[in-house]
């Protein structure tokens, strides 16, 4: 384990072409033009781009870079990149020059035909464009392949449709910026020039030994275990959560931090999570589009560094049954360029009219578009988490906490809030411990969308998913609520009276979305149904939300998605679900046919030989006989379930692609998979460990 000392401040951002580097290297005029583009969206002329490209190239070469790539996030959900070297055509003397033009910086042309488009373009229509997102800084990534200049970009088709997640995210950020500024102007704010959603993503993950990982085909092919009985101990003692970090894991975390700090990712918090072998990394918040890029970098770094330590990083939402899965809490707030957090209630929120209007608008947005918010977290792996007493339920609700709920209740009942509850002081009863300031409200870990002091925490997002989609939805639905409020208030004769009436109206009309209780309880499921809140339990049931008339009207109004782009994304998600379940089913078939059944057959022969030997010795063989009967019965159940899964999977493959096929995989193939797993997991508790064909749960999660 490396123990070399270093100063974080010295290495932080050393491989980022950030504002400090640009100020040092770019001519003053060029730097000012670029800042105008970043801050005000002004066009960047090619002459300026040429200068930036040259300096960026020179800087990258000094860092050892030989190639550059337009780094983008297509609809596969993972980043994509094509590497080009800086060399030009060889000169007559056989030498080469290292070149990089403004045109190469601003635009790239990857082949778009092999990326998901959901019917937006035919396979033969191959041209696509990447466009430089200058608001997210370029960086040099150093790995086994050398050093590469990575330029964050958006990705679109030849005809302009978004083929990525960055483009609609940037559109949604522009929408909320415009509408939030309208709202601020109503309150007399003339100084703020820009409003930006600020995001921080808490990343959960598992680590397992690489050699043990390689023995599990299910982990290799699907990222999760498809078979596996629980060991005698799981997470019931709560001794792993915040426990002492093992030396091997601590060494891994140290190297992850170093790699992230060098590329400007402000990794802040690390700890053991609830499940054995589960951990979390959380950064400091930043602008939404940068946070999306940094989270993708974080996931890549976790995987890459794990391999260097003889580990494998599992980002699947549910790699192991019986213990908690992994999520990604998306912490979201709205801040101005001059430091105002629109979600900061202050010490007396009942007097903070601007905050109360923002809060009322968010309640309206989430209540109206709960289905869209749920869909933004839809993922095949997340189907195993949501509503399973380890993650938020699949029902969208908002937790406000005691203080804000009290203010809301006052406003709804009387139209006026006269006081705010305070947290006060916490006396521990120990004279040597300091008196602590108590927060005005507790936390609620069971809520999918919780207010946590000066931000909202959306807890539904899956651990391996990009945070782009949830933030696209959040930005857009809140922009709509702001716009609706501004349309009313800008026409009001008496602003103060109108804004108080509007706050009361929004709070009253959307009160059903507020729930401060236990989201894991059956009582809440029943109560949510009485309130008319949607309970969307699966990805397949969630997808239709993005193509409703309501969704199309919303996204087209703010130019975030066209109807065609929404329909294409729905098609892509149905296809992704079907493919994911198909791969899982085929993997189960392969493992059952080639590993489990052969192992069971050998074991029954061993048992049968033992029974015969014991009987021949003239002693009681009832225990051996009973075990043989039990194993044989479960083996027969396994074979019948395997045959059924083979047939069901073949039937699914023959279905019409899209919603029909995805629905069949969900309703027929998934239950058939569960039916195959059940007898195999029972047999794992009976069969001799030496005869078991792969690493057990105990081996994987306790021997790291």
What are the residue ranges of the model-derived segments?
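Short linear, low-complexity motifs centered on an aromatic residue
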Residues: 77-93, 110-113, 118, 216, ...
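Active-site core of metal-dependent hydrolases
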Residues: 11-126
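Hydrophobic/aromatic-rich, well-ordered segments within soluble, folded domains that form packed cores
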Residues: 65, 69-71, 294-308, 334, ...
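Composition- and surface-driven signal marking solvent-exposed, interaction-prone regions
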Residues: 220, 295, 317-318, 344-348, ...
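Glycine-rich, acidic/polar active-site loops that bind/position phosphate-bearing ligands
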Residues: 126-315, 324-327, 334-571
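C-terminal amphipathic alpha-helical interaction region
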Residues: 508-704
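Short, compositionally biased "basic patch" segments
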Residues: 1-9
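Active-site proximal loops enriched in glycine and acidic residues that flank catalytic Cys/His/Asp
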Residues: 48, 72, 101, 283, ...
């Amino acid at each position: 384990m490396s123990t070399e000392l270093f100063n974080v401040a010295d290495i932080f951002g050393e491989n980022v072409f950030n504002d400090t580097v640009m100020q040092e290297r770019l001519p003053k005029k060029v730097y000012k033009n670029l800042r105008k583009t970043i801050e005000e969206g002004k066009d960047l002329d090619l002459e300026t781009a040429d200068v930036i490209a040259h300096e960026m190239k020179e800087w990258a070469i000094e860092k050892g870079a030989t190639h550059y790539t337009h780094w983008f996030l297509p609809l596969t959900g993972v980043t994509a990149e094509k590497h080009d070297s800086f060399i030009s055509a060889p000169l007559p003397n056989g030498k080469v020059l290292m070149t990089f033009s403004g045109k190469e910086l601003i635009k790239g042309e990857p082949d778009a035909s092999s990326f998901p488009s959901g019917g937006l373009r035919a396979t033969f229509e191959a041209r696509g464009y990447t466009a430089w997102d200058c608001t997210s800084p370029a960086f040099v990534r150093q790995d086994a392949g050398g050093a590469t200049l990575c330029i964050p970009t958006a990705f679109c088709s030849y005809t302009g449709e978004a083929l990525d997640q960055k483009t609609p995210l940037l559109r949604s950020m522009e929408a909320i910026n415009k509408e939030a500024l309208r709202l601020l102007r109503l309150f007399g704010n003339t100084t703020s020039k820009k409003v930006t959603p600020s995001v921080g993503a808490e990343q959960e993950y598992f680590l397992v030994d690489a050699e043990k990982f390689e023995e599990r085909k299910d982990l290799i092919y699907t990222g999760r275990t498809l078979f596996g009985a629980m060991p005698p101990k799981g997470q019931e003692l709560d001794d792993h959560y915040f426990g002492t970090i093992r030396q091997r894991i601590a060494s891994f975390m140290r190297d992850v931090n170093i790699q992230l700090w060098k590329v400007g990712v402000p990794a802040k918090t690390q700890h053991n999570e609830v499940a054995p072998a589960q951990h979390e990394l959380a950064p400091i918040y930043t602008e939404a589009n940068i946070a999306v890029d940094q989270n993708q970098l974080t996931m890549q770094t976790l995987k890459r560094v794990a391999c260097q330590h003889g580990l494998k990083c599992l980002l699947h939402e549910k790699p192991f049954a019986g213990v908690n899965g992994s999520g990604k809490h998306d912490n979201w707030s709205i801040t101005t360029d001059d430091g105002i957090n629109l979600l900061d209630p202050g010490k007396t929120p009942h007097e903070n009219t601007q905050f109360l209007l923002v809060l009322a608008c968010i309640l309206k947005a989430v209540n109206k578009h709960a289905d869209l918010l749920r869909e933004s977290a839809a993922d095949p792996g997340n189907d195993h988490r949501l509503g399973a007493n380890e993650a938020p339920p699949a029902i969208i609700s908002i937790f406000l906490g005691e203080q804000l709920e009290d203010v809301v209740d006052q406003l709804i009942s009387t139209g006026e809030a006269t006081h705010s509850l305070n947290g006060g002081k916490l006396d521990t009863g120990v004279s040597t411990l300091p008196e602590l300031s108590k927060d005005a409200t507790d936390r609620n870990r069971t809520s999918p969308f919780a207010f946590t002091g000066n931000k909202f925490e959306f807890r539904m997002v899956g651990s391996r998913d990009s945070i782009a989609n949830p933030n696209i939805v959040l930005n857009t639905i809140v922009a709509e609520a702001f716009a609706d409020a501004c349309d009313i208030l800008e026409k009001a004769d008496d602003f103060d009276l109108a804004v108080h009436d509007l706050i009361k109206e929004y709070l009253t009309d959307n009160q059903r979305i507020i729930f401060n209780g236990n989201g894991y309880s059956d009582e809440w499921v029943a109560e949510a149904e009485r309130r008319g809140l949607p309970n969307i339990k699966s990805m397949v049931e969630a997808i239709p939300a993005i193509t409703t008339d309501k969704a199309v009207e919303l996204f087209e109004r703010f130019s975030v998605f066209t109807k065609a782009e929404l329909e294409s994304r729905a098609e892509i998600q149905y296809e992704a679900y079907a493919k994911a379940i198909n791969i899982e089913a085929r993997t189960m078939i392969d493992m059952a046919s080639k590993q489990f059944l052969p192992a069971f057959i050998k074991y029954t022969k061993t048992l049968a030989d033992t029974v015969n030997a014991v009987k021949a010795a003239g002693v009681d063989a009832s225990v051996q006989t009973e075990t043989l009967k039990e194993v044989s019965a479960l083996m027969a159940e396994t074979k019948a379930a395997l045959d059924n899964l083979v047939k069901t999977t073949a039937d699914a493959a023959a279905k019409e692609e899209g919603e029909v096929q995805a629905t069949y995989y969900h309703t027929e193939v998934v239950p058939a998979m569960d039916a195959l797993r059940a007898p195999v997991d029972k047999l794992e508790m009976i069969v001799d460990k030496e005869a078991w064909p792969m690493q057990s749960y105990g081996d994987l999660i306790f021997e790291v």
